[in-house]
Amino acid sequence: MVSVTRTVFGELPSGGGTVEKFQLRSDQLSVDIISWGCTITALQVKDRQGKASDVVLGFAELEGYLQKQPYFGAVVGRVANRIAKGRFTIGGKEYHLPVNREPNSLHGGFTGFDKVLWTPQVLTNGVQFFRVSPDGEEGYPGELKVWVTYTLDGGELVINYRAQASQTTPVNLTNHSYFNLAGQGSPNIYDHEVTIAADAYLPVDETLIPTGVIAPVEGTAFDLRKPVELGTHLQDYHIHGFDHNFCLKESKEKKFCARVRHAASGRILEVYTTQPGVQFYTGNFLDGTLKGKNGAVYPKHSGLCLETQNWPDSVNQPQFPPALLRPGEEYNHTTWFKFSVA
């Protein structure tokens, strides 16, 4: 049984509209999602003692989400991740996007899908958000209709993304939640055990754009096919963290993507997706300056992201999975976040 409660979360400045919060509750999970950026603001998960903790980073008030902050919990688009130099070509025409993370365009530009108000509709077991991205928004061609649907089923949070375009355009939608299974506000994720079901990953240049090589994980720090404890693993390989796309099987079917286990609490997160990739990011750019929920500060490595997605810069890399959505087609992807305890 799932209950859905609708409340006001806050008012946007200068009459920009009302941001609403939707709380989805089952016996195992409670998830708060707001209509600003389709953002997950809280996710309460029980530990093996039955004690619930909030396992996502974020803010208690709307003001937190309106400041400069690293996409906590938000849906990002029209194209998640980086597009090299903020440009791409379709049918011989070059399109220019805002370069909001020098020298590239990141997560849809300066005003991506995370920084707009969506129109909500309550469902029996969740909430659906809708918006129309106008032709030319942030430099992207064509009008794009987008539906993001969150549903709850026991211990599983399901996110479905659908989109339809009036002109050929790249589309790549994901959710940018930062997880800490010890509870948000815990200082780091070093005691998290991570598994990612990927035989290959994408090496990147110094601006975090894939070089074009699809590299086997075998014998590298990127071999996460068997569980590794993050802190030890980062030390063993002398790396400062992950911010890389891992290549999953390219089938459109639901497939196992990743597993995160926090031994002390017993909490386990399993991720399944229809997408061909997942960006594993260990919060390397968090620096402790933002004040989060309950007075928490978020230093480097205090949360991890598993952003299911198409591969970064695929609009410019023909050997990557196709990036374009054409008129008459439908973009349709689903990701499942399944929580349990052991």
UniProtKB/Swiss-Prot annotation:
Catalyzed chemical reaction(s):
alpha-D-galactose = beta-D-galactose; alpha-D-glucose = beta-D-glucose
Task: Identify the metabolic or biological route this protein is part of.
Answer: Carbohydrate metabolism; hexose metabolism; Carbohydrate metabolism; galactose metabolism
**Where in or outside the cell is it found?**
Cytoplasm
Which family does the record assign?
Answer: Belongs to the aldose epimerase family.
The record's Gene Ontology biological-process terms are: carbohydrate metabolic process; galactose catabolic process via UDP-galactose, Leloir pathway; glucose metabolic process
PANTHER family from the xrefs? ALDOSE-1-EPIMERASE, GALACTOSE MUTAROTASE
Principal subcellular localisation of the protein: cytoplasm
Any one GO molecular-function label of the UniProt entry: carbohydrate binding
Q: How does it assemble?
A: Monomer.
Q: State the source organism's domain of life.
A: Eukaryota
Catalytic residues per the record? 176, 307
> Does Cytoplasm show up as a keyword for this record?
yes
Its protein name is Galactose mutarotase
